[in-house]
Amino acid sequence: MQPFIFLFILLVIGMMAKNQSLIIAVLFLLIVKSIGLSSKVLPYLEQKGIQLGVTIITIAVLVPIATGKIGFKELAESVRSIYAWIAMLSGIAVALLAKGGVALLAKDPHVTTALVLGTILAVSLFKGVAVGPLIGAGIAYVIMKIVDVFS
């Protein structure tokens, strides 16, 4: 019963924050639990969900290339802009942080609870976007490594 209550609270928070991704995710989980598929679906999502999500995000990022909106001409033009270089370096940094985040979440799953809470707070209070857990885990991973060096 506790998972249903917790998910319902998250649904209410998602509705108050008008966060469609959180609402859809919670409704999906409530339906899976309600129709008795949780023993099959949830372990799979727990194991492969982040990779599936990363794959979907990667597909979305590559769509402009597939549609022809971004081609070699746009690529060549973009390297002439300082903002493009800043964006490229930011993309590299975020990808490396996310890599550390995936490793941390796999190694230390209880960190997920704190990351999810932080993401929910950011989404509901500050109109943030719910991609935080992966990047948050990456930032936590880097900070934990720094703490390890000094302790």
Curated annotation (Swiss-Prot):
The residues that cross the membrane are 4-24, 52-72, 85-105, 115-135
Query: What Pfam family is a match for this entry?
Result: DUF441
Per the record, its GO cellular-component terms are: plasma membrane
Q: What membrane topology is given?
A: Multi-pass membrane protein
> What is the top-level taxon of the source organism?
Bacteria
The listed locations are: Cell membrane
Q: Which UniProt keywords apply?
A: Cell membrane, Membrane, Transmembrane, Transmembrane helix
PANTHER family associated with the record:
UPF0756 MEMBRANE PROTEIN YEAL (PTHR38452:SF1)
Protein family: Belongs to the UPF0756 family.
Its recorded name reads UPF0756 membrane protein Aflv_0503
**What species was this sequence derived from?**
Anoxybacillus flavithermus (strain DSM 21510 / WK1)
